[in-house]
C-alpha cells in the first residue's frame, strides 16, 4: 500500500542517511543514494534477496507480510514492490526502526514499523500473516525455538528462514527413532548430528549473538515447528510452508510455548537501544570505510 509520498531530493536523502548513523543493511534508495558500501559488519541484503526471490510470488496483491527483525526495511520494501496489501516490520532497536520508517517514507510505502522485542511480539500477537520473513535473526534470540514455533503458527502460506550456521556442509547424520542414554551417545556426539551451540561470550564482537545451529540442524528445527521444507537455496536459508507437526507431541498438540506466557504474562522489555560505545565504534568503522 502506498502512502502520500513526500518529495525527497538526492541531497536531502544523503543528509538523512548520514543523520541516521550506522546502517547494517546497505542498499540503494530512490535517486541512487546508497546506505553504505557493504563492508562488514554491515552487509548487502540484495545478495540474500536474490536467493529467495524465485520463491516469492510475482504478485503479492491482497497478501500480508511480517518482517521480523526487519532492520532498515530492505525486505519489507521488496514485498511492497510486489503489491503486498500490508507489511508489518518488527525491530527491537530504536536506531534501526528509525531507519526503516525513513526508508518507507522515501519509497512512499505504508510499512507498519513496530519497535518491539520479537519475543514479545510473537508471544502477545494474535495476528497471522500470509508471508513471514525470518532472516538473519534466529541466532540473535535468547529463546529462538519459541519464536520459530510461534512464527510457524502465524504463517499462512510461506516462511523465509535464514540463520548463520556452523559449517555450511549439509551432511547426513545417523538417526534413531529413539536415542538411548549411554549406548547412543556416540551418535549424538557425531559432528554431523543436528546441534545448537550456545554462546555465553561474544561472537564476532556482537553481544546479541546467543545460539548458532549447525547446518544439519536447520531442517529439523523447521520440521519440528510444524512446517515442511520446500526449498533450500543456500545452506543458511530455508523456504518453508505450513504442515502437520513432525516433531515431539504433547497432549496431542505440538510442543510450543503459549503465546501469552506464564505466571502473569510475558515480560515486555520494550524498545531497545544499541550500546552507545558499540554505536560509536560502528560509526568510526563507517567513516573509515568511506575513506577507502
Predicted regions and their residues:
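N-terminal, positively charged/glycine-rich alpha-helical extensions of SAM-dependent methyltransferases
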Residues: 1-34
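Conserved SAM-binding strand-loop segment of SAM-dependent methyltransferases
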Residues: 108-118
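Conserved class I S-adenosyl-L-methionine
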Residues: 63-71
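Glycine-rich SAM-binding Motif I of class I
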Residues: 72-77
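S-adenosyl-L-methionine-dependent methyltransferase catalytic module, highlighting the catalytic core
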Residues: 129, 133-134, 142-270, 280
